[in-house]
């Protein structure tokens, strides 16, 4: 369940703008046609999964089938579906041609942050509400995203970090997403997307920091000032696992996201011998599952100690 408000109430509040009524009605009538999850997982903590751009929740579940099976004693996976229509992603039609309609989390490169954030919240609410209706009772504790979904997951945990730092206890706010305790980012690249005025500020400061790092003629009065600007760049401190395929054509961009935006004290990189896809081989899946379980044990222990 969402904190402070049921998913049904949250959806109603989010849909106050006319812009979303038609899109929401269409989305709610679509059936994912997922087979019922193992009932033994209903009580387990849940990981919300965000698919890549140009796919959908049904396809992502098929792509995660080996990972979901290997995690079934530790976590329940819950799949959200983006609202924005999209052309199929690269190589999607080779296997999943008949699995449309295809969706994306980001409507366009210059998408309105308010529109995108409302759409994202609707997707998350809907996924959790439907899983609750199937009988799931475990808390939603983590995120798992692939490609564009990983970008959005990273943006969500940055937003959570900024919101907590700005407002402290924000339980009074009219709508709250679950508290993301960790995230697993598969083949994610930057830049992160803006979800509110908070991340707009962080994004501007990050761009300033990059300019100062790469331009000796920055015009700043002293090296001390330069250091102050760089230190204001927001590094994500929510625990994360970054999964990179060594044969992925965008590997350098995935590494760049990790080095530019994440505090290495709270994150770990797993690189595997694969391309731009979710790991399927038992050896790779076992390694990832071990990392997820170790991370969750650490996060849970630190909270108990705190």
Swiss-Prot record:
Family: Belongs to the LovG family.
PANTHER family given in the database record: ESTERASE DBAE-RELATED, ESTERASE OVCA2
Paired cysteines (S-S): none
GO biological process: secondary metabolite biosynthetic process
Gene3D superfamilies from the UniProt entry: alpha/beta hydrolase
A single Gene Ontology CC term: cytoplasm
Keyword Hydrolase: yes
Entry EC number(s): 3.1.2.-
Pathway(s) the chain acts in: Secondary metabolite biosynthesis
Protein name: Esterase tropF
Pfam families named among the record's database cross-references: FSH1
Any one GO molecular-function label of the UniProt entry: hydrolase activity
Function according to Swiss-Prot or TrEMBL: Esterase; part of the gene cluster that mediates the biosynthesis of the tropolone class of fungal maleic anhydrides. The pathway begins with the synthesis of 3-methylorcinaldehyde by the non-reducing polyketide synthase (PKS) tropA. 3-methylorcinaldehyde is the substrate for the FAD-dependent monooxygenase tropB to yield a dearomatized hydroxycyclohexadione. The 2-oxoglutarate-dependent dioxygenase tropC then performs the oxidative ring expansion to provide the first tropolone metabolite stipitaldehyde.
Record keywords: Hydrolase
Keyword Membrane among record annotations: no
Recorded superkingdom: Eukaryota
Signal peptide start-end: none
Origin species: Talaromyces stipitatus (strain ATCC 10500 / CBS 375.48 / QM 6759 / NRRL 1006)
Active site (UniProt): 147, 248, 276
SUPFAM superfamilies: alpha/beta-Hydrolases
